Every structure is written in C-alpha cells, then in structure tokens.
Amino acid sequence: MADQNQVVRAAGVLMAISVLARLAGFIREQAIAAQFGTTMATDAYVVAYTVANIVYLIIGGALATVFIPVFASYLTGSNPVDAKNKNDYRQQNHLDRRSAWNLASTIINLTVLVLGGVTIIGIAVSPWLVQLIAPGFAPEPEKVQLTTQLTQIMFPITLLFALSMLFGVTLNTLQHFAVPALGSVVFSLTVLASVFTLGATWGIKGLAAGTVIATVFQVAIQVPVLWRKGMRYSLVLDLKHPGVRQIGVLMGPVLLGNAVAQAYVFIERIIASHLAEGCIAALNFANKLYLLPFNLFALAINIAIFPTMSAHAANNDLAALRKTTFGGLKLVGLLTIPAMVWLIVLAEPIVRLTFERGAFDDHSTGLTTFALSFYVLGLFALGAFNVLNRAFYALHDTRTPVLISIFTVLFNLAMALILVRYLQHGGLALAAALAANLNLILAYYFLRPRLPNWRGRELFAPLGKIVLASGIMGAGIWVTARCLIQLTGGSTGLMAQLLTVGIASSVGLIIYLGLIWWWKPDEELVEMVRKMGQRVVQRVRG
C-alpha cells in the first residue's frame, strides 16, 4: 500500500504539472503553426530538429534508461556489482550517498565530453547529414541550404537535452518529480516567446535559436534542486567505479535498440521528404496531438512507477514488481483508451480548433487530420509498452527490449514502404501505429514468464470493461457532434469548433466516468484514480 501511495502521489504531481506543460506545449505548437503553417520553412525546421535531436535520443535516452536502476541500487546499498568489487570500494558505505554522487558526477562529465564532441562534429558535417536524411529536398537548393543552417543552429540541443534528462532522472530517483516535469513548461514558454520575438525578426532561424535557448533554461532550473537534494558535483572521471562499468554493460543493448529505433525515424523522414510539400509538417503536428494523451497520462505514470519498479527489482521482490506493473498497465488503459476514441471521433474539429489560423489553412487541416486518424490507433499500445519496457529495465534486462525493437522497426519499415504507396503520409502514421501494437504484444509475451503469479484475467477483465465504456462514450460523442454540426450549419469557424469539441467532449466524459464508476472495472484502480485526482486538484490549486 505504501508503494501504491508513493506511485499515486508521484503520478498525481506529474499529471498536475503535465496539464500545464501540455497546455504550454499546445500554445507553442499553435503559434508555430499560425506563424509558419505547413510550409517549406516548417518542413526544414522539423528535419533540422530531427537531425539535431536524434543523437541525444540514441545516447542520452539510453543513458537515462540504465542510469536509474544503477543509481537507485547505490542509494539503497543493494548493488550486486558492488558486492563483487569489495577490493575497490571495501570502505564505502553505500547508504552514505558519496559513492552514488561520485557515480553521478562521472556520468555527467562523460556526457559533456562525448556529446560536446558529437555536437562540434555534427555542426561541421550538417550539410551531409541533411542530404542523408532529406534527399527529397535535393531539387530545391534553397530548402537544403535552409535546413542545413537550421541544423547547425540547433545541434547544441543534443548535449543540452541529454543533461536535462540526466538531471531529471536523478531527481526522479530521489522521488522528486515536480521540477523535472516543469522543465517542459519552461521549454515550451521560451519557444513560444521566441516565435513572437526572434521568429518575428529572423523568421524560422529565430525560432531555431529560441529552441536552443529554451533547452538551456530547461537544464538550468534543475541545478539548484539537485544541490538541495544533496548532490555534490565534482570534476571527477572515475572510470573504475563499478557503477560506471555496470552502466556501460547495460547501455550497450539499449544503445543498439535506440539506434535501430532512430534509424527508422531517419528512414521515415527520407520517405516523407519525397512526398508533397507540407507532409512532414503535417506528420509533426499530428504527432504532437497524438502524443498529448501519452505525455499527459502514460508518460507521467511511467516516470512515476520506474523508481518504484527499480527498487522492487533491487530488493528481488518480483511479486511487488508484477503488482506495480499490472497497476501501471491498468492505469494507462483507463486514461489512454478513451483518449484514443476521443481523438478518432473528433479528429477534424480538434485539428481545426487547435491549429487552423494564420498560415495553417484548410488544406493543412486535411493533411494533419488524415495522419492523426492513423497515429492514434497506437496510443494505448505505446503507453502500455513503456510500462512493460521499464519492467525489463528494472530487472537489468536491456537485451530483450532491444531484440523486440529491432524486429518491430523492421516491421515498421516494411509496412511504411507498402502503405505509403496507397495512403501517402497517412501510410507512415499507420505503420507506426501497427508497430506500436506489435511492440506491446511481444513485450507482454516475453515478460510474462519473468514475473510470478502472472494472471492475465486480472489484467484483461478490467481492460475489457474500459474498452466497452470507451466505445459507448465514443458513440455518445459522435451523436452529440453530429447534432452540433447541424445546429451550426457545418461552420468551420473558431466558435463552432469550440462548441462542437467542448460540448461533445463533456458529454463523452460524463458517459465514461459514469460507466466506470458504475462497473468499477478494478476497485484498486478506482481508488488510485480517486487519490490521484485529489492530488492533481491540490497541486493545481497550489
């Protein structure tokens, strides 16, 4: 119960802040859409951001994933590697945090050295990177030149994002979640400000510069909190620390898996660069909408439960790890399955309401809605897969997720090459959704024998009720939306879309909450949501 309350408190804090973060992020995307639309400049910005961000996603993402379990084991004094290296650290009391902070300082310094060097090299070879990732831009030299310049401006975010994530997961391990989550709010607000300041003066290049400034702020706000939590940074490079070696061993498979996953992102951009102008931007805007429920609900849950899962695994309490994993899966389903239905039924009015203004016209809405309708089919799978993935990582098993990723990326690529012929950019979105569902199926299959007392009925019975409640909710939303569209005469104006989305969503929410409360798919789940709701309200009220 104590672990459950800890997860609920953490998830509640994260969701409360996520409400602010997603609101800020949406206003940011609205501003970018209104200022630049689905134009050549936006396509160039998206590709440049991808090039600059991809190295961080490969290296920084892998580092953050394996750092939490190792760092947590040093904080709790239960690191199995240390027990085999008593000659090196015989006098070290791991309940004293000096060894943990020594490990953290070494990893931070290695990150600066490695990704700092990668940034310098990346800026130098940007012209070739752009040709590699967007060969379809070649017939338009102006577009290639602009993309190259934007890539060179934004390449420092490779290092800055990695530091931000490393600081964030360190604080998460210490059960502090608020400030790392607030980092995305600071990032979005800074980028938003740059749209109207630097962007208004220097166009898309100003937006690129503002993106870099935003990542600097995202890193900076976490430093004082780390210090208050007891971190004592030092210019140490202790490569003999057993934790460093352990991270190195664990990181290899994750690095490979991330590289494979990001290779697909490269390939997707290559394919999309050959499509009509605006398709890359439309995929980007649709992806932002699709990931809204994931970032707001599923990601918050995953971040909140990972330290708890790591602690259970470190203590070899596999029964508790299974229970936490099941709780995470059910909570993800409770929140993302109705969100899937909501986005499917109201896709077009949501896109119009969110983006259609300024340079983002009716054509842009059509492109974005088409992609969104396919992306959203993978929403629950994406959130649930992340829960299962973290269970593997908590068990220090990085090999299985990598093998799964390699297989599903190849599947994703094959589907994309087939579907893009018939659905254009929608084919890329559908391929991603199919791959997300395959990821979930494989992860479930391979994790099941690893944890004791795995009872599928305990998981699928409540999820079945959630699916049924979501379907009835979707029918209510559809009927309400059709009536409102008739009442407004099919108007695409802002107020008409606001009424349609607002009223239909409210009706759907009432139906869904009523059915969930009536059917009670899982008593423990309902209690967790009740506590989480109280926590969110408390945080929002301050």
What are these regions (language model features)?
Residues 1-542:
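Membrane-embedded alpha-helical bundles of multi-pass transporters/translocases
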